[in-house]
Swiss-Prot record:
Membrane topology value: Multi-pass membrane protein
Binding sites annotated in the UniProt record for Mg(2+): E364
Residue span of the annotated presequence: 1-119
The protein's name: Cytochrome c oxidase subunit 2, mitochondrial
Gene Ontology terms, MF aspect: copper ion binding; cytochrome-c oxidase activity
Binding residue positions for Cu cation A2: C362, E364, C366, H370
Originating species: Glycine max
Function: Component of the cytochrome c oxidase, the last enzyme in the mitochondrial electron transport chain which drives oxidative phosphorylation. The respiratory chain contains 3 multisubunit complexes succinate dehydrogenase (complex II, CII), ubiquinol-cytochrome c oxidoreductase (cytochrome b-c1 complex, complex III, CIII) and cytochrome c oxidase (complex IV, CIV), that cooperate to transfer electrons derived from NADH and succinate to molecular oxygen, creating an electrochemical gradient over the inner membrane that drives transmembrane transport and the ATP synthase.
Record-listed E.C. numbers: 7.1.1.9
Length: 394
């Protein structure tokens, strides 16, 4: 039987725990709209990382991105979503306001500067030049936050990020699901331990219990606190082992094999399937783009001069090694992290489920410029991948 104070404390602890659990599951929710004639998927996102804001009229779909300098790169493809033009905007920080887009006018402001871009961040879209007015409408962003409680895919690390990057492979989705499952048990254990601690502090303080009762031994309670933790650990261990073994599964006949070689301080990639006896090969070095050379829309310390282009929805094998010291090839959205050891070949298998650009970094301290070894994976359609390979080989 709980006293009123205990009931009050337990009630609030349970409320906070449930809210925390719901917030974790909320991070995996996506609301997807229909496709337009341009073939680009429309999403609705409403947190401060990305927003899809709606404007009326017209028959174009505008895709805009903010980089960390609060500038905008514009992407335009034909087609509408239910007769409504959509604008996809990436907001760099919590204090940034929402924007509404309309065509045929052009203005330049410090926080909404419009720049034409031909980046391949949005695959399969027809990039065209167009002038568009960006009008500040903070009411729109607040309204969207209240109406649609979803968040955007996060394929690169963000400032003050608390959760995982969104999964692009079955392995990463399994990691996120396992985290949520374990977090449920952690909440229950935390609530129980907090209740026991607060109850002991309240009922056994010196005023209420001046002569303490000393308990030397209790068989029942010792059995209970041995059995229950063991059962909880079993519930945690079984799915953990299943996920661990699935991460070690190697595809016997992968569609594409890529070799990643770590150097101080850059990566070299070789597409082994396209090497032949005529000394024709597909290989390149991938260096980080210096901050002074970044174009608008590119991410600081994450962009490279040559991306690793792979087809989406295809079984891939990546062979990883090093030419000098220890490195580690890691891409969080793909759920992969593999050490690059000199004189040894490690391999991982992955299956990217959606098109996009995924950022990673070397995750093993390898010297002075360890922080300047980014990894960029661009997953495109099979058709675009074939065109890219043809252009590289020829």
């Amino acid at each position: 039987i709980l006293c009123p104070l205990e009931a009050f404390i337990v009630q609030h602890i349970l409320t906070i725990s449930v809210m925390g659990l719901l917030s974790c599951f909320r991070s995996t929710v996506l609301r997807k709209c229909s496709k337009g004639s341009s073939g680009m998927s429309r999403f609705l996102y409403t947190n401060n990382f990305q927003r899809n804001l709606i404007s009326s009229g017209g028959n174009e779909s505008y895709y805009g991105y903010f980089n960390r300098r609060s500038y905008t790169s514009l992407y335009m493809g034909t087609g509408t979503v239910g007769g409504i033009t959509s604008a996809r905007i990436r907001v760099p920080n919590v204090g940034c306001e929402g924007f509404m887009c309309s065509s045929h006018l052009s203005i330049t402001q410090r926080n909404s500067r419009l720049i034409h871009s031909t980046s391949k961040i949005v695959p399969n879209s027809e990039i065209q030049n167009i002038t568009t007015e960006m009008v500040k409408t903070p009411e729109v962003s607040r309204w969207m936050d209240q109406v649609i409680p979803t968040i955007a895919p996060c394929d690169a690390a963000e400032p003050w990020q608390l959760g995982f990057q969104d999964a692009a492979t079955p392995i990463m989705q399994g990691i996120i699901d396992l985290h949520h499952d374990i977090f449920f048990f952690v909440i229950q254990i935390g609530v129980f331990v907090s209740w026991v601690l607060l109850r002991a502090l309240w009922h056994f303080r010196s005023k209420m219990n001046p002569i303490p009762q000393r308990i030397v031994h209790g068989t029942t309670i010792e059995i209970l606190w041995t059995i229950f933790p063991s059962v909880i650990l079993m519930f945690i261990a079984i799915p953990s082992f299943a996920l661990l073994y699935s991460m070690d599964d190697i595809v016997v006949d992968p569609a594409i094999t890529i070799k990643a070689i770590g150097h101080q301080w850059y990566w070299t990639y070789e597409y082994s399937d396209y090497n032949n006896s005529d000394e024709q090969s597909l290989a390149f070095d991938s260096y980080m783009i210096p901050e002074d050379d970044l174009e608008l829309g590119q991410l600081r310390l994450l962009e490279v001069d040559n991306r690793v282009v792979v087809p989406a929805k295809t079984h891939l094998r990546v062979i990883i090694t090093s030419a000098d010291v220890l490195h580690s090839w890691a891409v969080p959205s793909l759920g992969v992290k593999c050490d690059a050891v000199p004189g040894r070949l490690n391999q991982i298998s992955t299956f990217i489920q959606r098109e996009g650009v995924y950022y990673g970094q070397c995750s093993e301290i390898c010297g002075t410029n360890h922080a300047f070894m980014p990894i960029v994976i661009e997953a495109v359609s099979t058709k675009d991948y074939g065109s890219w390979v043809s252009s590289q080989v020829n």
